[in-house]
């Protein structure tokens, strides 16, 4: 529903501004430019989708090997001590615990197709424990925030888009996304714990979150000792080594479980081809809408307005061109993806704006969509502090993404 409103708004606002420019300013080129943008954008959307097929098939094939090799189960076991403290209202040994672990682990690995059904199952089980069936319980809200904060270990789709858009090193945003998504998730956990009066000084929570903060601080400090060129080389090298380790690790996990690794890869790769074809109409719709919006001058007005405000406050405005992606992300994943592609098309995949838009895309998730799907599936009407916690986590992710982008690419 939100995406419907956004799609309609792109055209209505573009038409109104185009009419104003024609009638008041005498700009006879605005409507031809808007119509040309529809043809160019639809062509671009198809070409991007076509180019995605190979790389998407590769990574979904690798992910299928990991899934069949039990990597999700391993992550679930690692997370279990911490999650027991984050969900104190869930009885020990309840089946919902397994569903929550599996959902979060699948999200961390970027297995969206597996994560959503597991998430809906977990929400149904949480509803069974909920004394007020129309009101979100504390475990429901914590579970939702962990989903909306978008903790991701392998941002496959973003790297795939960067490769297709001609980035020299599609993986150079890997480390920045890991750092930004860590901050959004940490903020979401802390804020939700404060709302729910959960003891953050519990030994397990304190050691885990504190230890992660120390590791992230050490990474940031280490990169801070390097100049920009060294930072880019080290970041890209580490990212590629980590990704190769993940690929080999998934294959070894599959072999250990006696999985037919080749067949598992082919099964996942087929899903990649299907996914690439399935996204064509969605990408056409959103890129055409954005193209018309930009051709009318509306996007420039939005960006220039924010830029003026930032300049008035004495701030650097390099990040402003990527803000449409950040603003769209809580509302629509497809819309944000379109904004990211538009930013890379307009400014370049290796520009500061192009990279930052990718980090925005990877640092958080679609808060309102997840809230509507998960809570709607069990008939929740009163969301309590879920929206506030989710949006504050998004804000933390956006601010972290900006700071980290200036550090790595500024």
What are these regions (language model features)?
Residues 101, 105, 140, 231-234, ...:
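Generic signal for short, ordered secondary-structure residues
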Residues 2, 6, 91, 98-100, ...:
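Generic hydrophobic alpha-helical membrane-segment signal
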Residues 60, 94-96, 136-139, 240, ...:
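Sparse, context-dependent recognition of short Cys/His-centered cofactor- or disulfide-binding micro-motifs
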């Amino acid at each position: 529903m939100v995406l419907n409103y956004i799609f309609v708004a792109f055209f209505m606002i573009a038409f109104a501004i185009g009419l104003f420019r024609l009638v008041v300013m005498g700009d006879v080129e605005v409507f031809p430019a808007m119509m040309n943008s529809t043809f160019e954008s639809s062509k671009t959307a198809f070409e991007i989708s076509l180019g995605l097929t190979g790389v998407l098939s590769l990574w979904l094939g690798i992910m299928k090997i990991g899934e069949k090799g039990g990597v999700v189960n391993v992550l679930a076991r690692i997370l279990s001590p911490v999650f027991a403290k984050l969900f104190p209202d869930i009885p020990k040994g309840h089946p919902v615990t397994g569903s929550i672990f599996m959902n979060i682990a699948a999200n961390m690995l970027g297995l969206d197709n597996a994560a959503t059904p597991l998430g809906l199952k977990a929400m149904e089980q949480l509803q069974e424990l909920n004394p007020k069936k129309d009101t979100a319980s504390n475990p429901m809200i914590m579970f939702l925030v962990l989903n909306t904060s978008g903790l991701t270990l392998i941002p496959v789709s973003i790297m795939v888009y960067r490769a297709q858009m001609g980035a020299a090193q599609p993986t150079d945003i890997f480390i920045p996304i890991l750092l930004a998504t860590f901050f959004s998730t940490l903020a979401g956990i802390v804020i939700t714990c404060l709302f729910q009066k959960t003891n953050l000084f519990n030994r397990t929570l304190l050691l885990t979150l504190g230890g992660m903060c120390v590791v992230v601080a050490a990474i940031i400090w280490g990169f801070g000792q390097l100049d920009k060129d060294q930072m880019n080389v080290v970041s890209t090298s580490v990212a590629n080594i980590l990704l190769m380790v993940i690929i080999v690790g998934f294959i070894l996990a599959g072999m250990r479980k006696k999985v037919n690794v080749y067949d598992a890869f082919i099964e996942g790769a087929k899903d990649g081809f299907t996914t690439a074809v399935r996204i064509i109409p969605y990408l056409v719709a959103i890129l055409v809408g954005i193209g018309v919006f930009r051709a009318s001058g509306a996007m420039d007005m939005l960006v220039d307005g924010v830029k003026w405000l930032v300049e008035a406050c004495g701030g650097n405005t390099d990040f402003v061109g990527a803000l449409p992606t950040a603003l769209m992300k809580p509302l629509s994943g497809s819309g944000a993806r379109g904004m990211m592609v538009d930013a890379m098309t307009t400014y370049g995949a290796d520009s500061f704006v192009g990279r930052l838009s990718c980090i925005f895309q990877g640092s958080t998730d679609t808060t309102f969509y997840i809230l509507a799907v998960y809570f709607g599936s069990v008939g929740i009407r009163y969301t309590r502090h879920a929206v506030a916690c989710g949006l504050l986590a998004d804000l933390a992710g956006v601010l972290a993404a900006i700071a980290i982008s200036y550090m790595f690419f500024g």
